[in-house]
Amino acid sequence: QNPLILKAKAMGLETHVFAWAAGDVGETTADHFYPISIVEKEQILEQCRRIGIDGVCTIASDLAAITVNYVANGLGLCGNTMECTEKSTNKHAMRLAFEAGGDPSPKSILVHSAAELEGAALEYPVIVKPVDRSGSRGITKVEGPAGLAAAIENAKGQGFEKAALVEEFAAGQEYSVECISYQGQHHFLAMTKKFTTGAPGFVETGHIQPAPVQPEQLAAVKQVVFHALDTLGIRNSASHSELKISPAGTIRLIEIGGRMG
C-alpha cells in the first residue's frame, strides 16, 4: 500500500492507514497509523467516523476492498455497494453474476471436497482455485482425476471461506485490463500482456504494457470488460480485469477485482 500512501501525501492529503502491525514501511510513511486488522470493519468504520474522513481506498487487496466499501457505505462516501463487493471479491458469486449477465467466462462448480464431484462429467484439464483469494494464491491446473483432491485441499487451505472452485480451463494468452469507474462511467486505462510460470501455479513473471494487440481486438476487449463491470455493479472504483484471448480471438473473463491491480 505504500505507493498509494505516498501518492496521497504528494496530493496534499492527510493519510490515515489501517493494518495489522507488522513493521511494514507504510506504518511509518502514513501520517497516522492504526494497528487494526483490515477485517475489523466495525472498528475501522467507527474510527473513520471519529476522524471525519473524506474518502477511503485501497490497492491490490480484495480483502481490504470489502472494508473500504463497508466504510464508504457507512459514511455516505464514494464507493461501490456491498452487493457489488460480494460479486467482485467472491469468485463463486462472480461466476454466477457473469452467467446471469451473459458475460463470457469459464463454467465452474463450488465444492468443499473432491467427494462432491463423484459422478460429475469433468472435462480435464480443470483449474482449481480458492473462492476468495487474489494474487494467484492456491491456483492449480489439474490434468486428471488423480490430482483433484490434493488441489481442492490446497485451494481450501489458501482461502478464508475454506471452499474451492473447480472450473473449465480457458486456453489462450493472458491479459489484464485496468479501468477507473465513476458514477457508472467506465474509463479504460491500460491493457497488459502477461507472462506466467504456466501450470501448475501460474505465477506472474513479466508484463508488456501497452499490450501489442490490434485496434479491433482492443475494442472488443473494452466492450466485454465494460459490460462485465456493469454486471458486477462496479460504479465507483478502480478495477483490475483478468482475461484470456484464444488463438481464434475469443475473449473469456477469468475474474475482475473492484480495486487497483
Predicted segments, located by residue:
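Hydrophobic residues in well-ordered beta-strands that form the structural core
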Residues: 17, 79-81, 107, 128, ...
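Short glycine-rich anion-binding loops that position phosphate/pyrophosphate groups of nucleotides
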Residues: 61-63, 133, 259
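Active-site nucleotide/adenylate-binding loops and adjacent lid/helix of ATP-dependent enzymes
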Residues: 89-172, 182-185, 207-223, 227
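ATP-binding N-terminal substructure of ATP-dependent carboxylate-amine bond-forming enzymes
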Residues: 1-83
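Alpha-helix termination/capping residues and helix-transition junctions
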Residues: 27, 50, 102, 157-158, ...
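Short, charged, surface-exposed secondary-structure boundary motifs
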Residues: 26-29, 43-46, 87-93, 136-138, ...
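Conserved residues at the C-terminal ends of beta-strands
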Residues: 36, 59, 111, 192, ...
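Phosphate-binding core of ATP-grasp and ATP-grasp-like enzymes
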Residues: 155-163, 168-212, 219-253, 257-261
